[in-house]
Amino acid sequence: VAVVGAGGTGAYYGGALARAGADVTMIARGPHLEAINKNGLQLNSVLLGDFLVECAATDDMSSVGRVDLVIFAVKSWGTDAAIEAMASGDMVGDGTMIISTQNGIDSEPLLSKAFGSEHVLGSTATVSAMITEPGVVNQAGGPGSLVIGEMSGGSSGRVTSLVERCVAAGIAAEADENINMALWMKFTFICALSGMTALTRKPIGDIFAQETTTEMYLQVLSEVAAVARAEGVPISQEMVDATLKTTQGREPFIIGSMGHDLIAGNPIEIGLLNARVVEMGKQHNIPTPANFAIEAALRPHEDGA
């Protein structure tokens, strides 16, 4: 297994598999890479417990060789460079499966274009995990789920077996025969969560404590769903309302990944999330004022502080 981008999310899933005995190589860089090589990866998780796992780590993808599974977990601004390095590193062989934990709806098409659609499974990862210091990842929120499916729909032996391996490692994994719907539902959820927590620089508890921000949160969700329907994905208003209700029941301290990146002064994924909704809305003549407001406020921060 190769984890391309061993930040919070990649390290959580890769660390769980490594603890269960999988041969995992973490692709990381800088002090985080040095710390993993020196001390191992320390994962502190409310779901999996706290543990230290020894695993290979490198910043050179050409040294990894062929793998059975790639977990593609880089931030969106690193996608093109990571795909290029993967391609030159000969990591993808005949039977290699690639799953992406990235936010957004664009990584599966990009990976399919680079490596062939037969290698790419659809997947959605829902976990709140972050690097708190080099070599240390904390997972404090989110269900830690991983939903996997064939992009063409239906079931397959490779999806079933991958899900079984993940479940055996303690990951809340499941197969989905309509993964495209799952990808769009996650996109809808994350545009609101990340967009609104970045816009307000506040966790969801503070957002839902105010009528105005709750109303805007729902508007973001509804706009994404309208765009999804225009793209042929039937997300109903009932599903939107259920998503809002579920989010309101989550831990009040949760901040979306874009909110964390903004607060830390890192580049943010606005182009992949709310701005993408605005772009698709224009294509379909669907107004997206709430997503546009988020894009307008956050574009100046796109490249970090």
Question: Model-flagged regions — what are they?
Answer:
Residues D50-V136:
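Rossmann-like NAD(P)(H) cofactor-binding subdomain of soluble oxidoreductases
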Residues G89-G93, A114-H119, P134-K186, C191, ...:
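Internal alpha-helical scaffold of NAD(P)-dependent oxidoreductase catalytic cores
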